[in-house]
Amino acid sequence: IHKSAICEPLQGENAWSYAEKLKLAISSIRDHMFSEFIFCDDAKLNEIEENIWIARNIRHAMEIGELFLVYQPIVDINTRAILGAEALCRWVSAERGIISPLKFITIAEDIGFINELGYQIIKTAMGEFRHFSQRASLKDDFLLHINVSPWQLNEPHFHERFTTIMKENGLKANSLCVEITETVIERINEHFYLNIEQLRKQGVRISICLLYTSPSPRD
């Protein structure tokens, strides 16, 4: 399929700037499988440029600690009791400020970085949960919810690595809930189901996470 990207040069724009915009537009063509032409205005080009910047900088951001976890309480609406907490990854860039998790998680999946990022999230969440549990009195049914991409569950030995991290932190399986993000849930393989089955056998809860926000437990 032959495609074309059309960018309207702005008044006073030099050839270098226009060439850079055209390169950004062409790089986005793979995301438009059914379009012969892609028209890129400044807003679209800014979005493409931001996506490329995220792809180039997310690994470094993780290494220098710009990526971190916050914990959203999960509350029973009837009793107002705190049932657990969901670990949510956030990115505050020194250069660009707050980066949307909906954007950087999706890009991490697109560039094949989600497994490395995902394991870092799991290690951090379990480690911080262990420290918090030692200082606070939590109920036995308190659940730590951790978002996991289907790409991670497609890995042959995910449940083994998850279990290893869990044991290293002295956590019980029934205190953890794996939240499966729905971004690419249609691209699952046989390892996906095996990993889920093995985690459930150990007592880990499994649920579906809608757009990285609200949990919906499934026993």
What do the predicted segments below correspond to?
Residues 1-6, 133, 160-164:
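GGDEF/GGEEF active-site signature
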Residues 1-3, 67, 85, 142-144, ...:
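PAS and PAS-like sensory/regulatory domains
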Residues 10-68, 78, 108-112, 150-159, ...:
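C-di-GMP signaling machinery
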Residues 42-107, 147, 179, 208:
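Active-site core of bacterial EAL-family cyclic-dinucleotide phosphodiesterase domains
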Residues 75, 150-152, 182-184:
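Active-site-proximal loop/turn and secondary-structure-junction residues that shape catalytic pockets
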Residues 113, 117:
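Conserved acetyl-CoA pyrophosphate-binding loop and the N-cap/start of the following alpha-helix
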Residues 120-148, 164-175, 198-202:
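Helix C-cap/alpha-to-beta connector motif
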Residues 163-214, 218:
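The catalytic core of metal-dependent phosphodiesterases that act on cyclic dinucleotides
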